[in-house]
Curated annotation (Swiss-Prot):
It comes from the Bacteria. This is Ribosome maturation factor RimP. It comes from Prochlorococcus marinus (strain MIT 9312). Required for maturation of 30S ribosomal subunits. It is found in: Cytoplasm. The gene is rimP. The lineage of its organism: Bacteria, Bacillati, Cyanobacteriota, Cyanophyceae, Synechococcales. Signal peptide: none annotated. Belongs to the RimP family. Keywords: Cytoplasm, Ribosome biogenesis. One of its GO terms (biological process) is translation. GO terms for cellular component: cytosol. It holds the Pfam family RimP_N.
Amino acid sequence: MNKEQKSRLENLLEKVANVLDYKICSVNLQTNQNPIVIKIIIKKTNGDDISLDDCALFNTPASEEIENSNLLKCSYVLEISSQGVSDELTSERDFKTFKGFPVNVELNQKNSKIKFLNGLLYEKSKDYLAINIKGKIKKIPFNEVLKISLCTLKD
């Protein structure tokens, strides 16, 4: 499948997603498989979680649109899934959901020897991130934070 065909396929799938209030996160074609595999990752436009029923709901009209478009002249398998849980915390919802969970905070302090801090997610405000490091609360200004990721803590 060439770039133009893939672009047409993505546009077609976007139309189906828009009708159902979903957003296409990615479309991955595995043309080395027989039949080829089309992996589509979707999310809801309102930020709610994607369920198995949502994937099934998207599958039928997506399959029909692909068939009606005659873009693919061969058999294919359509796989619909959600984004899943990312290790990186980015949204307000992530910070509420994972409060108390172990996190790794990557710092952008160029002159400091400390590049990472590990602790339990305690609080997030608009100005700082607070983590619990062995019972002590450490407030880190957001301008010093590069990335916040879930991790596992070892004693």
